[in-house]
UniProtKB/Swiss-Prot annotation:
Cysteine-cysteine disulfides: none
UniProtKB keywords: Ribonucleoprotein, Ribosomal protein, RNA-binding, rRNA-binding
Keyword Ribosomal protein tagged: yes
Entries under InterPro entries matching the protein: NA-bd_OB-fold (IPR012340), Ribosomal_uS17 (IPR000266), Ribosomal_uS17_bact/chlr (IPR019984), Ribosomal_uS17_CS (IPR019979)
PROSITE patterns recorded: RIBOSOMAL_S17
Keyword Ribosomal protein attributed: yes
Description of how the protein assembles with itself and partners: Part of the 30S ribosomal subunit.
Gene name of this polypeptide: rpsQ
Name by which UniProt lists this protein: Small ribosomal subunit protein uS17
Organism whose genome encodes this protein: Rhodospirillum centenum (strain ATCC 51521 / SW)
Family named by the database record: Belongs to the universal ribosomal protein uS17 family.
Primary role: One of the primary rRNA binding proteins, it binds specifically to the 5'-end of 16S ribosomal RNA.
Gene Ontology CC: cytosolic small ribosomal subunit
Length: 85
């Protein structure tokens, strides 16, 4: 089964090796056929504490790391800046 990849914005980086990522989706309302925004927060593993609030990152599904962490950060603004230097 392939691992899901989502894109979102870091809204908290207070935990050690953890960031909270807000993922927004556009879904169509089943009755009114209007697109509405739905958002959900995911706790993601950030091994190097590299990502800060406001960074746009991609997270990938992984094995459970803790009670709430089942995602890991794979790419983002900090990773691209480090690769460019």
């Amino acid at each position: 089964m392939p691992r899901r990849i989502l894109q979102g914005t870091v809204v908290s980086d207070k935990g050690d090796k953890t960031v909270i990522v807000l993922v927004e989706r556009r879904v169509m309302h089943p009755v009114y056929k209007k697109f509405i925004k739905q958002s959900k927060k995911y706790a993601a593993h950030d091994e190097a504490n590299a990502f800060k609030i406001g960074d746009v990152v991609q997270i990938e599904e992984c094995r459970p790391i803790s009670k709430r962490k089942r995602w890991t950060v794979v790419t983002g603004a900090a990773a691209e800046a480090g690769a460019a230097s």
